[in-house]
Amino acid sequence: MGKEKIHISIVVIGHVDSGKSTTTGHLIYKLGGIDKRVIERFEKEAAEMNKRSFKYAWVLDKLKAERERGITIDIALWKFETTKYYCTVIDAPGHRDFIKNMITGTSQADCAVLIIDSTTGGFEAGISKDGQTREHALLAFTLGVKQMICCCNKMDATTPKYSKSRFEEIVKEVSSYLKKVGYNPDKIAFIPISGFEGDNMIDRSTNLDWYKGPTLLEALDQISEPKRPSDKPLRLPLQDVYKIGGIGTVPVGRVETGVIKPGMVVTFGPSGLTTEVKSVEMHHEALQEALPGDNVGFNVKNVAVKDLKRGYVASNSKDDPAKEAANFTAQVIIMNHPGQIGNGYAPVLDCHTSHIAVKFAEIQTKIDRRSGKELEKEPKFLKNGDAGFVKMIPTKPMVVETFMSYPPLGRFAVRDMRQTVAVGVIKSVEKKDPTGAKVTKAAIKKK
């Protein structure tokens, strides 16, 4: 066995009819972990329903449908391998909760793959009516997804087919708006593809011999290696807390930054509860240490299940321990709110695993969301498309951090009326010092 490949996450974005499902389905189909029997079953069903043309998207639709019905899909189905990486596709958008998942999501995407419909009319639709293309690209950039690959899809259906001039026209236009969002187009690979026919997806296409750049597979291999934040202090937001007979209390969550290991004394924010970690395990195997990206359960001493909750954050008691936020200031972008948002607005914030109502105490400034320049001091309200700096006060104890220090704990979705109405990035946090927090015997011994 050679060294295991590096894991990276990609998020596929673009307008609703751009061919995201077909393209993603094709990659997973050709390079992925989908069992051949499953594919044959899908193909048979697709043929029976005269959906032959829909083969790759059909694979993805079946996976989505099964996942939405709560049938746990083997997550390997959403993975594929390149020569250098194991790639996981983060929730393909179009899914209702895509924006929320991208923000609070189990993982930060390392690269966005933007799919553009190159057909006449298709491209214009995706880009114009404030199509989702812009919104998704802005979102990816705001949330720190700095690498991008842009696929000009449906090249088999341009007029004439595989048109070089159409490709060049699209590259020019898309470059100019990605630049407005904040990306540097010179660092983005633009690839003419057909997700359905397979041109330039994995193998070089003879239909596009005028194109000299990388195929999609080669471009994915050229993504620069993500740096995992294991050198930062520990932050592990809890997803659940279990009581396991014979073992005791076992909090479960994903290490976002730093490391956790047996013997470490951890402090849980916001309550300040401090105790010793007895053991750490992943997939039923004991670990000597867990690193960022690992989903782990860990056993803590002298702690009742009721003392810990989803949304609490485990941290190293000796290294910048997590504390309750008294208030924080964030850059907020309003994305789909039907009215006006003024001081006193109190929606729910989804930040890492916590889900807590937060009050917009003071809208400090309205800013240009691309350049960050101030447009207005203390505006009365913010509406759709606006961005601003807002001071926020949680209605219940919660842990948040600045996006600079701990990115996964510094971005959030604002939820109201069952949808994501805004996204935000935290710039500064005022923390409370815990008073009278419980320190277990095990932790005192370790001191």
From Swiss-Prot:
Residues 14-21 are annotated as: G1. Residues 153-156 are annotated as: G4. GO terms for molecular function: GTP binding; GTPase activity; translation elongation factor activity. GTP binds at residues 14-21, 91-95, 153-156. It is found in: Cytoplasm. GO terms for cellular component: cytoplasm. The modification N6,N6,N6-trimethyllysine is found at residues 79, 187, 306, 396. The modification N6-methyllysine is found at residue 261. Residues 91-94 are annotated as: G3. Residues 194-196 are annotated as: G5. It holds the Pfam family GTP_EFTU_D2. The modification 5-glutamyl glycerylphosphorylethanolamine is found at residues 289, 362. Keywords: Cytoplasm, Elongation factor, GTP-binding, Methylation, Nucleotide-binding, Phosphoprotein, Protein biosynthesis. NCBIfam families: EF-1_alpha (TIGR00483), PRK12317.1 (NF008969). PANTHER family: TRANSLATION FACTOR (PTHR23115). Belongs to the TRAFAC class translation factor GTPase superfamily. Classic translation factor GTPase family. EF-Tu/EF-1A subfamily. This is Elongation factor 1-alpha. It comes from Daucus carota.
